[in-house]
C-alpha cells in the first residue's frame, strides 16, 4: 500500500527534480526531514535496503537541487543508497512495489527512469562509468556535468582507484562525491572542516590558486614552492592527500547532513574544471536511532513496525545454507589449523561471524576486493595452507581471470564456497547467481559440486577441503530443506551421483530427471505425479557419465534440472556426454533462459521459468505424452 503524500506537504511539492529545484533553499531542511520520514514509513511496509538510504537523504536533495538532472548525469555506486533518489524522481507512489515482481527495481535501472543514468548493483563501478560519460559529453560538445556518488567501502576496491588514476590523468570535468558513512577515512569533521570546504570552493581561494599558477607557470622553482605551500595548508586539516596525488581537487570533509552546506559547496564546485572530489561524512541509518546504532543489522530489513524500534524476530525455520557453511567452517577449523578462510567484505552474509570470533588468526576479510581475495587464497594454498574463499556467485564473476590464471592453471587446493548461487530473488539481475555453473565447468582442473540439501552441502564442503585441488561448492540463498546435517564428515566419491527414486513402471516408457542442486524437492514432487526416476547428480564436474548413459539407455527421455543458465550449464554437459558416446536421446533441459532474471521471490522465478514441480511435469508430458 502506497503512502499518502498529503501527509508530506513539502515532499508533495518536490516529486520530480525540476519541481524540487523550484523550492527556495530554506525549504530544503524541511524537505529532507519529510523524505527521511517517508523512506522510513515506506521501507518498513515493504522491506528492502534501509540504513544506507537514511544516510543519503540530504545529499540526494542537494544533488538534484544543484544539478540539472537528468541532463546532468548522476550515478550511484552499488545503489543501496538510492531509495531517496527514486522517491524524488517520480517514483514515490510506487515505492510499495520495490524489489517485487513487476515492481520497482531494487537498484538504479535505466529502463525504469531517465534519472537512472547507469545500471548498478555491484560495487565500485560508478567512477569508471562517470568518466566515460564525461568524455562522451566533451566529444559531443554538451555542457553536461557528471557526478558519481561512491561510499567509503566501495572506494576500497581496486576498480575505483583505477578509475581515479585515469580520471586524474586525462583531467576531464567530473565530480566524485565520497560518501563516508563509516568514519573510515577521517573523524576530523566539524565546523573548521565545513568552513574550510566552503573556503576551498570559494572564488577567492580558487582565483588566487589559479591566478598564482598562471603567474608562476614560467618560474618552475617558485611554482613548485607555491604548490607545496597550498598542499601543506590543505594537508594540515584535510585527509585528502591521496586524491590530490591522483590528480583530483579534494574538497572536504563536510557534514553530509547539513543540506545547505552541501548545496553551497556543490554550487561552488559546478564552476570548476577538471576532476573534483567532494568528501561528505554521513551517518548510516541517520534519523532512526536503532539503525544508527546497528547499521549492519538495518542495512536490509524485512517488514517491521517503526514504533517498535526493533526488527521482528524471524520465525523458526530451517538453517540457511550460509549458516550450514559457517558451522562447517568452525568445525573444520577446530580440526585443521591450516584452514584459512577469506571473504571479500561479506562476513555476515556468508555466515562467518562466529568463525571470525572463534578463529581470528584464520580469518581474513580483504574488503571489497574479489580479485585480490582469489589470488590471496592462491598464495595461501601455494605455500601449504588450506584456503577457503567464501564468495557470492555474482561477485565471483569479478575474479574470473584470477580463478583461471592463479588457481586452476597451478591446480592449487583452493575451495570456493559459492553462496547465492542460482536465483536470489528480490535483488534482481545484478545479483542472480545464474552463470557460475557455465563459467566454472569449462575450466580445467576444477571440481564443481551442487548440494541438494544441508547434509549434502556439509559433506561436499568437506570433500572439497580434503581434495587438494581447485573445488567449488555452489549453494543457494536462504533456508535449506530441513535436513539435519550429519555431525560426522565424510568425503564423497568424486563424480558419483545418487539415485533418489526409481520409477515403478517400465523404464522404457518413463522419464529420468537428472537433478543438479537445490531443486531436488521439486523433482521428487514431480516424479511422484508422473512416476519418474530421479537422480541427484551431485557433481557438475566431473559428471557421472556412467549414470547419464545408464539413464539414457533405460528411459525413453531425460530431463535435466538446474537453477543456472541453460547455455553452457549442467544440461549442456549431459548433452555433450551423450554426443561423445554416440547416444541419441530426447532430452529436455530445464534451467534459466538466455535473458537476465528480474526481481521477484525465488518461488515466483522458479514458477515463471518452469523449474517447479508443475513445470517439470509439463516438460515430461511434452516428451512422453
From Swiss-Prot:
InterPro entries: Dxylulose-5-P_synthase, THDP-binding, Transketo_C/PFOR_II, Transketolase-like_Pyr-bd, Transketolase_BS, Transketolase_C, Transketolase_CS. Keywords: Isoprene biosynthesis, Magnesium, Metal-binding, Thiamine biosynthesis, Thiamine pyrophosphate, Transferase. It comes from the Bacteria. Its EC number is 2.2.1.7. Mg(2+) binds at residues 152, 181. Pfam families: DXP_synthase_N, Transket_pyr, Transketolase_C. The keyword Isomerase does not apply. Thiamine diphosphate binds at residues 80, 121-123, 153-154, 181, 288, 370. Its cofactor is Mg(2+); thiamine diphosphate. Binds 1 Mg(2+) ion per subunit. Binds 1 thiamine pyrophosphate per subunit. SUPFAM superfamilies: Thiamin diphosphate-binding fold (THDP-binding), TK C-terminal domain-like. GO terms for molecular function: 1-deoxy-D-xylulose-5-phosphate synthase activity; magnesium ion binding; thiamine pyrophosphate binding. GO terms for cellular component: cytosol. The keyword Metal-binding applies. Pathway: Metabolic intermediate biosynthesis; 1-deoxy-D-xylulose 5-phosphate biosynthesis; 1-deoxy-D-xylulose 5-phosphate from D-glyceraldehyde 3-phosphate and pyruvate: step 1/1. Coiled coil: none annotated. It catalyses: D-glyceraldehyde 3-phosphate + pyruvate + H(+) = 1-deoxy-D-xylulose 5-phosphate + CO2. GO terms for biological process: 1-deoxy-D-xylulose 5-phosphate biosynthetic process; isopentenyl diphosphate biosynthetic process, methylerythritol 4-phosphate pathway; terpenoid biosynthetic process; thiamine biosynthetic process. Catalyzes the acyloin condensation reaction between C atoms 2 and 3 of pyruvate and glyceraldehyde 3-phosphate to yield 1-deoxy-D-xylulose-5-phosphate (DXP). Belongs to the transketolase family. DXPS subfamily. Homodimer. This is 1-deoxy-D-xylulose-5-phosphate synthase. The gene is dxs.
